[in-house]
Amino acid sequence: MGLSFTKLFSRLFAKKEMRILMVGLDAAGKTTILYQLKLGEIVTTIPTIGFNVETVEYQYISFTVWDVGGQDKIRPLWRHYFQNTQGLIFVVDSNDRDRVVEARDELHRMLNEDELRDAVLLVFANKQDLPNAMNAAEITDKHGLHSLRQRHWYIQSTCATSGEGLYEGLDWLSNNIANKA
């Protein structure tokens, strides 16, 4: 009896740790999102060559978030970050209509990787504050998300600079990763 109570208590109140990989094309807003979550403020960013990694504490969960640069020359390196990833955040620049096909192709290429087969997918439809931004439904359609029948996925409209939508996305991510455990 005591052991089961201890397990229940630790399951409810112990800090959970989750490994999250955040990728997307260059200039989608990944680093801005990372530091908005970590610091609650906008930081001046430069294109990420390599990666940034931060621990984001949110609702009894410790998210280790790997933000990996998105320039086309370094995308082949993404695969080195796949191991043990529980959640994949794919950040889309909702205003970048010219690279929708490129973003879709990169997303599907990653989702076909064996090391990511169990990872849940959160798509951040970022830059929703811009006047020409595609909404979440349009991004869902253009990225072929409905074809992902064997994967838990969710799309969240966001604005990295204001923080709008980011924590709603983390809520979904934490609930879905915890349910798989």
Swiss-Prot record:
Catalytic reactions of this protein: GTP + H2O = GDP + phosphate + H(+)
Compartment annotation: Golgi apparatus
Lipidation feature positions (N-myristoyl glycine): G2
Binding residues annotated for GTP, in chain numbering: 24-31, 67-71, 126-129
Family the entry assigns: Belongs to the small GTPase superfamily. Arf family.
Role summary: GTP-binding protein involved in protein trafficking; may modulate vesicle budding and uncoating within the Golgi apparatus.
Protein name according to UniProt: ADP-ribosylation factor 1
Organism of derivation: Catharanthus roseus (Madagascar periwinkle)
